[in-house]
Amino acid sequence: MTTGPTTPIARLRDVSKVFDPKGAAVTALSGVSLDIAPAKLTAVMGPSGSGKSTLMHVLAGLDRPTSGTVHLGDEEITKLRDDDLTALRRRRIGFVFQAFNLVPTLTVKENIRLPFELDDRRPKADERAWISTVVHRLGLEDRLKHRPNELSGGQQQRTAIARALATRPDILFADEPTGNLDAKSGREVMAIMSEAVRDFGQSIVLVTHDPIVAAHADRVIFIADGTPATELNDSISPEAIASTMLDIDERADSAVSR
């Protein structure tokens, strides 16, 4: 992939997504155009049903837009066939979910290397060295032979992050990664993600409802009614994020009452 210093790692152009369950059309995204900067942590927030999860799914190629285009670097992924899109996700995109999604019968080491198994190959020497670096930085060296049920929630999520980073993805998507963790483990996970951006140049898009989690971001995008409503790029704090969310909720309530 070719990207310059200012080239977005991912971008949407005039993207809409309409779901049509049983003939009742629901617009989840409406004409969204958005650039995601490389080597930054971008948080996406919004009220329930605002479209933030759909935005992430479309960006990650997990869902196709009804209209518009999605690019990963210079490649338009909306044109890809399903099998090519699956291969792209496996090789160039990392995922971290709230529920960890570890394979219970595999050890930590096997879970981390799972993306290579799914790609029907073994990691090369430089990839093994990278995995060792990630394992060390995430403090998992003494847990490699353990299975998920022998780990704490924080250790399970660290394993999931290591798995997501193992292939050195162009971009990592995290959906409520601290949602199942206690406050201490949540802080540790967000510190790891911040370090991945700062030390490894990793690009991360994070969906969360928690202002404390979002405050780790370099940029916070607020989604309302299927479109970006506003964003924060400077002076990002839990208080500023909570205040912005309150303003969005109040505007929505005012619109409904008219």
What residues fall within each predicted segment?
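Helix-to-loop junction immediately C-terminal to a conserved catalytic motif
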Residues: 60
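Conserved ABC transporter NBD signature motif
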Residues: 68-76
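Conserved ABC ATPase "signature" region
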Residues: 75-76, 120, 124-142
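Short coil-to-helix segment of the ABC ATPase nucleotide-binding domain corresponding to the Q-loop/switch region
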Residues: 106-115
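Conserved ABC ATPase signature
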Residues: 147-157
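Conserved catalytic motifs of ABC-family nucleotide-binding domains
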Residues: 168
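Catalytic Walker B motif of ABC-type/P-loop ATPase nucleotide-binding domains
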Residues: 172-175
